[in-house]
Amino acid sequence: MQIGFVGLGKMGAGMARRLLRGGHSVVATDRSEFAVSAVAQEGASPAADLAALVAALEPPRTVWVMVPEGGATESVVAVLGKLLARGDLVVDGGNSNFKDSRRRAADLSEKGVLFVDAGTSGGVRGLEAGYCLMCGGERAAIDRLAPALTTLAPPDGWLHTGPAGSGHYVKMVHNGIEYALMQAYAEGFELFTASGYELDHAKIAALWTRGSVVRSWLLELAAEAMRKNPSFEGVAPWVEDSGEGRWTVVESVERAVPAPTITAALQARFRSRQESSYAARFLNALRNEFGGHEVRKKG
């Protein structure tokens, strides 16, 4: 099928290439001329901007958006809403908030434009291994998009999750679980460092990927990371969060659904960014006040 592709970052470029290798016709655009040139060398038709991309597509058009969530996605979808016609389809494959996706679907529907929110997992290795795709939207839109989804995903690697917003909702929870898994692995391997045993962390992680009940792709990546840099030399103890973990925690509060493990994993990331924790210094001082406990001085 013919598909317009907006956004050629780390994942977007890989997805465009996978579509090309699967025999699809891709018209691509990005703010980076270098990124557009790179996929054009592999067979994509370059477009200078969104207007040029839409003009190059045959109706009914399908445009896949793969840009950062928030303002970038809002801007691109708004422009596409003005350029596209009834029967065209917009796919948001980024990590948008599911509430935004529901709103965008409703706004585009008023113009007769279809919308699919496609939660995408697979990272930079998805080009070769395929991408897991969680897709919300009308059945007609999903059916039309199915050839591209089948190419992008590994066997049985995509699912119509329900109406608009459901794809990004499922991806949000997916990422919340990812936070918790990563934190559990990190805590376990930190315990190894204090065990008194001279353990090879990379070999243990690799071992656990073979038949263990805690095996996962994340653990495979951890084994590779520890093999390359066993002590994580030069890696700062600063852990960013990209938004979905926060949204998962907020949703759990709004729904009154306990999610203590995911919440703790998110809070651990916040703590990692504090060079000097006020709360820890508060506790240190308070113990001295009520019990005369020794205060460990800074520096």
Language model features by range: what are they?
Residues 31, 44-103, 109, 127-137:
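Rossmann-like NAD(P)-binding element
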Residues 76, 97-186, 192-195:
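Rossmann-fold dinucleotide-binding core
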Residues 293-299:
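Alpha-helical transmembrane segments and their immediate juxtamembrane flanks
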